[in-house]
């Protein structure tokens, strides 16, 4: 099976220039593909697929516009993948799965440099470095994290990305799937929430990391740095003396703080999932949360976004597949919080402010733990 590994790299200055050029070219080609298809649509012409666009770009457009010859200097596979990403975005729009594709803006969009293994010498990986096409050998900061070629592992493809002045490589490695699952323990239910991040039916509670003193301090620092950046932009608009280099420095400070906060949240999710999976349950049941609907509530949207529920579900599903654990998804309309775990009665007048569930049968329990118990014993579900 294929497994992904992502780690930070330490490229040289020359390699950094190549990464910046390739990512910039990929962003330009992606935007050009969107703009060209919009123009074709306005003229009443047929939609151009990624294959037709590449033929038209190489055989017609670049020969007529030599000023864009710098496009050919970038790694060809990365450029091809950016066009394919554009077609995927249109396909999702045509299938009513997402909104109309948006242009990618420099510094604000997640654009990556894609690479693939074309010959045996490409994508070789050693303990402390990896060979990336068009870049050569690049040093890895976390030594030994990616399985090495010497041990018989094969890197199929990967991407190089940049975030807050730090560079990362993500690779797909072909590994053998020979794990024998030993999940003899009872199943568990997990209720996700805002007061606490996750409540497990076995009584374990994972606190909301966003309420920790460390994150609160970082968020206050982020507000101060954002305010400072806004003042610099305002001074620039007014015509006052403000060096653009100082704006870029301040912008980088803000990006690094965003990145640090995001890394803390992601690390907490990874550790939570690892701890849950180590208990070796026979199955795990979670609720299909309507995150998009929750985000529409302006009072809760920030708190919901910071919890990263979708990332938790995605990573939990991957870990369950790797360890042979059945992941059950209960419908979002299942009244897990309002149902009494003791007698099965539904308390329709339960409010969000009611933190203790009290039933007429005499059953009293924390509402989140009651929901986790109901999810564990749910009969109607789908296997992810």
Describe each PLM feature range:
Residues 1-79:
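Gly/serine-rich nucleotide phosphate-binding loop at the start of the catalytic core
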Residues 52-163:
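Acidic carboxylate diad motif detector
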Residues 4-8, 137, 157, 187:
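Well-ordered beta-strand positions in beta-sheet-rich domains
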Residues 3, 148-151, 163-384:
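Positively charged, helix-rich recognition surfaces that bind polyanionic ligands
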Residues 34-41, 90, 94-101, 175:
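Long, hydrophobic, amphipathic alpha-helical segments used as structural scaffolds
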Residues 6-8, 85, 129, 168-170, ...:
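Beta-strand secondary-structure signal
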């Amino acid at each position: 099976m294929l497994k992904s590994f992502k780690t930070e790299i330490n490229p040289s200055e020359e390699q950094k220039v190549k990464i910046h050029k390739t990512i910039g070219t990929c962003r330009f080609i992606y935007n050009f593909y969107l703009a060209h298809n919009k123009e074709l649509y306005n003229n009443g012409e047929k939609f151009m697929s990624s294959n037709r666009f590449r033929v038209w770009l190489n055989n017609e457009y670049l020969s007529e516009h030599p000023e864009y010859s710098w496009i050919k200097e970038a790694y060809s596979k990365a450029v091809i993948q950016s066009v394919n990403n554009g077609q995927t975005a249109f396909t999702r729009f045509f299938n009513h799965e997402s909104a109309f594709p948006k242009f990618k803006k420099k510094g604000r969009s997640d654009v990556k440099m894609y690479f693939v293994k074309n010959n045996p010498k490409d994508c070789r990986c050693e303990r402390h470095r990896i060979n990336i096409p068009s870049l050569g050998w690049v040093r890895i900061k976390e030594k030994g994290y990616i399985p090495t070629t010497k041990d018989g592992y094969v890197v199929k493809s990967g991407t190089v990305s940049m975030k807050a002045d730090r560079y990362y490589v993500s690779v797909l490695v072909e590994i053998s799937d020979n794990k024998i699952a030993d999940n003899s323990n009872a199943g568990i239910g997990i209720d996700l929430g805002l007061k606490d991040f996750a409540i497990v039916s076995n009584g374990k509670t994972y606190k909301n990391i966003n309420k920790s003193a460390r994150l609160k301090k970082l968020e206050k620092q982020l507000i101060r740095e954002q305010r400072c950046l806004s003042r610099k932009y305002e001074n620039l608009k007014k015509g006052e003396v403000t060096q653009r280099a100082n704006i870029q420095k301040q912008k980088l400070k803000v990006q690094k703080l965003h990145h640090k906060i995001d890394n803390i949240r992601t690390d907490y999710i990874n550790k939570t999932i690892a701890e849950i999976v180590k208990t070796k349950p026979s199955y795990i049941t979670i609720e299909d949360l309507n995150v998009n609907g929750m985000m529409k509530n302006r009072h809760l949207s920030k708190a919901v976004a910071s919890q990263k529920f979708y990332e938790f579900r995605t990573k939990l599903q991957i870990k369950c597949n790797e360890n042979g654990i059945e992941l059950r998804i209960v419908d979002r309309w299942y009244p897990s919080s309002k149902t009494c775990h003791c007698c099965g009665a539904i308390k329709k007048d339960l409010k969000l402010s009611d933190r203790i569930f009290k039933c007429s049968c005499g059953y009293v329990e924390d509402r989140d733990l009651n929901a986790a118990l109901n999810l564990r014993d749910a009969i109607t579900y789908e296997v992810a």
